[in-house]
Every structure is written in C-alpha cells, then in structure tokens.
Amino acid sequence: MLFRSQTHVFPGVYMMVAMLVVALSGYQVQSYSAKDILADVLMTDLLNRMDKDMQVGYYDVGNEAAAGSKDNVDLVSRSEYARLCDGGSDCILQSGSASGAASHPSLRDDEFLQHSSLWGHQFISGGMGEGPNRYPTIVKNDAGLPAYCNPPNPCPEGYDMETQGGSCIVDFENTAIFSREFQAAQDCTCDNEHMFDCSEQDSADVGGDKGDLNSAVEQYIMQMGQENSLNNVNSLAKKAGYPVMPDPRLDDAVINPFLQGDRLPIAAKKGNLLFH
C-alpha cells in the first residue's frame, strides 16, 4: 500500500530519470567515432588474450604463489619461453581459434632470433675491416717483452722477499751513487716499444767494428758543425735580411716601447719595414 502511494505521488520523477538515461545514452553513441570504436575493440581483444595466456603474478618477481613452470618465464630467453609454451613461437599473440590466429599474425622472425649464450673475449688484429686490406696484418704478442735485468734490481722499501717471493736484491746501499753505478753495470734487454733509448745496445749488437765506425761518423759530423759555426750564437741565420742601418728620418718618430730591449730570436719571414 505504501509503495503504491509513493509511486502515485512521484510519477514524474521516474519519467524524468528515464528520459535522462535515454538522452545520455544517445549522446554517448553519437560521440563515438569509428576510430574510437576500433581502438576500444583492439584494446579489449588484447587484454582478453593476455588474460587468457598470462596467469596472476606473471610479472611479480618476488611472488611465491606464482612459482609454476609457466609463471616465472625469463622474458629474455626466447627459446626457453617457446619450450614452456608447448613449442609455440609466440604464446602472447596466439589465439584459441583458427580465425583468430589468421587475423593476428605473429611477430617477425628477425625479432625472435635466439642468440647464443656463449660469450668470451674478442681480439682484433689489425686490418682494414671488410674493405680491401692494403696494410699487412699486425698481431701484438707479449712474447717479445724484455726480461729482468742481470743482476736483478734491488727490492722496494718494505718488501719482504721471504713471504712475497721474488728475485730482487735485499742487501744494498740505498744511495744515488750506488744506484747509478749498479744500473750502468746491469745487463738488461732493451725494447724499442717500451723504453726510450736502445742506441747503446744496438751499437753493441752490430759489432765492435761497426760501433766504432758509427761513433767516428758522429764525431766527424759534430766537428764539421763546429767549424761551420752552426752553434755560434752571434752568427746570422740564412734568409736573415740586411742589417738595419740608422735612418735620420726616424729621429722625430714615435718610439715603440715594444721594440726596445733585448730582441727575441724570432723573425717574421719576408716581413717588410712598415712605419706609421
């Protein structure tokens, strides 16, 4: 009885609510375009397929409940992922029906290439790459490194040879004179790639006669240079120009302070005398 009375009292309220719902639904249908409907359908289809293939907790790393063989799949290992999906190459995009599989093609093969898990160091030995190689191949080798000197060097300060091993000299005089004489008496292998000067060893290797000849040639060249006054500071360099003669017209000229004092050993090549 009470319900009938309330319905009889407010008949217009229900009518207004019904009209409002119809108006809003009509506005919503008109506002939808074909592009929006297509995007909505594609998103719904994608979520449905992902929900069908993926279980709850698939992306949760620390979830102990999702400890099944198909839940904790390494996303990097493509071959393992295909094996866990019963041989399928693309479990995410697979559909239950044949028409769905035809309408949703799998990803390209290049994106699913399985790389080898083997790794190691890579060495490059010269060359010009894939182009024509005009230079000889050079491979660095550590077999030619210089050996230790004979006798060996003194031990560093604080070095314990009994516990740390080695072949250095423990008892020695730690002075500059001893170090200079000791290094001069050592027989060391000289390496041109790791040492500054190997001239003494090269001259000793070529033989005594050729070593004396090289030293004689060097002395002759030095003597010729001294006779030609190449080391004379006061000598004029080639293309130095004529000596400057005093000019009476420059007596009243403004003196440049930067030209006073000692002249630096710098001369402008083919420079002209300019007066302002």
Swiss-Prot record:
UniProt GO MF annotations: enzyme regulator activity; peptidase activator activity
Subcellular locations according to the entry: Secreted
Transmembrane recorded as keyword: no
GO process annotations (BP): neuropeptide signaling pathway; positive regulation of proteolysis; regulation of hormone secretion
GO CC field: extracellular region; secretory granule
Cysteine pairings via disulfide bonds: C155-C168
InterPro entries to which the protein is assigned, alphabetical: Secretogranin_V (IPR007945)
Keywords: Chaperone, Disulfide bond, Secreted, Signal, Transport
Major location category of this protein: secreted
Summary of the function given for this chain in its UniProt record: Acts as a molecular chaperone for neuroendocrine convertase amon/PC2, preventing its premature activation in the regulated secretory pathway. Binds to inactive amon in the endoplasmic reticulum and facilitates its transport from there to later compartments of the secretory pathway where it is proteolytically matured and activated. Also required for cleavage of amon.
Family of the protein in this entry: Belongs to the 7B2 family.
Subunit structure: Interacts with amon/PC2 early in the secretory pathway. Dissociation occurs at later stages.
Annotated protein name in UniProt: Neuroendocrine protein 7B2
Record lineage: Eukaryota, Metazoa, Ecdysozoa, Arthropoda, Hexapoda
Gene: 7B2
